[in-house]
């Protein structure tokens, strides 16, 4: 691993030296790959226009991030910004100098990259969904158009993945091999769900059982390794030790914070899809109109941006996890049930008044 790490540091130094002027763009691309944006941006847009794609996106994102956590616990991957300080391979304490940024100091293990895995997951789902839509009703005349669309969409996919990967390497939070593993892992998870149609008809019980399994497996795995005297939170004190600015350390980057966030979202989706509000909005005649979907999408994006103003207290870790679960569960409840139902009732009332 020292070979990969040492050469990875050289790549990071090259990027930071020669591409420093592109920091704003690279920081933006890092945010594009942020797993949290799946729930705040990609999901509300996709679900309001195509419920099948939106539902699949949540399952892919949650299972993908859960697998990412398990692999991080198994692989014990270092992050560049602390590895250069901890390693003994550099003689006479001549550790390379890596610049740190406000988004550098993530506290969990580094391999595979969660941002790269999350970005490849959701964009794979969106690209394959768009391509399957273009195939429907295709005749000989449109075969050329389909091929052009295929080439364009996959080019966009890889452009985004490469940009996200470079951005994560640039800020010294990942080594190159870690982002490559993330992209491959995300695509494999997304492809697996292309052959899992059962999630579209999953009952509330299925959602609850899945949630319980993911939680118990993760906690059980953590406790088992603790019994074996293996600390899975080993990276947190190292991150705090070598982060250039203590204010850049955030509790929501710890391994369990991501687990709680994902379980909350899946829990909320299960309740929302099986709720009376969602079923009533689906039965409405407006559900399939473009105006209804646009209004739901815009309202969802607007309301979810307000969630960023809901600051969860971080002084008590257990309280933070509970509130984070509740906040995450409310996202699909808002997008899937509350907003479509409210828009449906408003359009229904306005329709009665116009008659």
UniProtKB/Swiss-Prot annotation:
InterPro entries named in the record: Glucose-6-phosphatase, P_Acid_Pase_2/haloperoxi_sf, P_Acid_Pase_2/haloperoxidase
Keywords assigned by UniProt, alphabetized: Endoplasmic reticulum, Gluconeogenesis, Glycoprotein, Hydrolase, Membrane, Transmembrane, Transmembrane helix
Pathway linked to the protein: Carbohydrate biosynthesis; gluconeogenesis
Residues bearing attached sugar chains per UniProt: 92
Membrane-related topology note: Multi-pass membrane protein
GO biological process: gluconeogenesis; glucose 6-phosphate metabolic process; glucose homeostasis; regulation of insulin secretion
Tissue: Specifically expressed in pancreas and also detected to a lower extent in testis. Expressed by most islet cells in the pancreas (at protein level).
One Gene Ontology cellular component: endoplasmic reticulum membrane
S-S bridge residues: none
Topological region Cytoplasmic: 46-56, 137-146, 190-211, 283-293, 340-355
SUPFAM superfamilies in alphabetical order: Acid phosphatase/Vanadium-dependent haloperoxidase
Stretches in topological domain Lumenal: 1-24, 78-115, 168, 233-261, 315-318
EC identifiers of the protein: 3.1.3.9
Annotated TM spans: 25-45, 57-77, 116-136, 147-167, 169-189, 212-232, 262-282, 294-314, 319-339
Reported modifications of this chain: N-glycosylated; the non-glycosylated form is more unstable and is degraded through the proteasome.
Chain positions recorded as substrate binding sites: 79, 168
UniProt short sequence motif Prevents secretion from ER, positions renumbered to this chain: 352-355
Localisation: Endoplasmic reticulum membrane
Positions of the catalytic residues: 115, 174
Cited function: May hydrolyze glucose-6-phosphate to glucose in the endoplasmic reticulum. May be responsible for glucose production through glycogenolysis and gluconeogenesis.
Family the entry assigns: Belongs to the glucose-6-phosphatase family.
Protein's recorded name: Glucose-6-phosphatase 2
Source species of the chain: Homo sapiens (Human)
Gene (UniProt): G6PC2
């Amino acid at each position: 691993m020292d070979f990969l790490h040492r050469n990875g540091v050289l790549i990071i130094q090259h990027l930071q030296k020669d591409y420093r002027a592109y920091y704003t763009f690279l920081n933006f691309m890092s945010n594009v790959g942020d797993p949290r944006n799946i729930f705040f941006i990609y999901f509300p847009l996709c679900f309001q226009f195509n419920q099948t794609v939106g539902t699949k996106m949540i399952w892919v994102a949650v299972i993908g991030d859960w697998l990412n956590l398990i692999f991080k616990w198994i692989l014990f991957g270092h992050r560049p910004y602390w590895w250069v300080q901890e390693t003994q391979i550099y003689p006479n304490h001549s550790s390379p100098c890596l610049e740190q940024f406000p988004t550098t100091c993530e506290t969990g293990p580094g391999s595979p990259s969660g941002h790269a895995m999350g970005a490849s997951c959701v964009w794979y789902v969106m690209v394959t969904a768009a391509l399957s839509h273009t195939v429907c009703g295709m005749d000989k005349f449109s075969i050329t158009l389909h091929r052009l669309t295929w080439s364009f969409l996959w080019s966009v996919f890889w452009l985004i993945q490469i940009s996200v990967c470079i951005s994560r390497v640039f800020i010294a939070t990942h080594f190159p091999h870690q982002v490559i593993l993330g992209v491959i892992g995300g695509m494999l998870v997304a492809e697996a769900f292309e052959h899992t149609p059962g999630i579209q008809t999953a009952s509330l019980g299925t959602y609850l059982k899945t949630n319980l399994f993911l939680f118990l497996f993760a906690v059980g795995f953590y406790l088992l390794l603790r019994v074996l005297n293996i600390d899975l939170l080993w990276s947190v004190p190292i991150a705090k030790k070598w982060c250039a600015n203590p204010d850049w350390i955030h509790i929501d980057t710890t391994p369990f914070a991501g687990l709680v966030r994902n379980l909350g979202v899946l829990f909320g989706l299960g309740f929302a899809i099986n709720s009376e509000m969602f079923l009533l909005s689906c039965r409405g005649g407006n559900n399939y109109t473009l105006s209804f979907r646009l209004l739901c999408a815009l309202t969802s994006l607007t309301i979810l941006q307000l969630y960023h103003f809901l600051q969860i207290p971080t002084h008590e870790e257990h309280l933070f996890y509970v509130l984070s679960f509740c906040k995450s569960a409310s996202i699909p409840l808002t997008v899937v049930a509350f907003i479509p139902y409210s828009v449906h009732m408003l359009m229904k009332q306005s329709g009665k008044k116009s008659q």
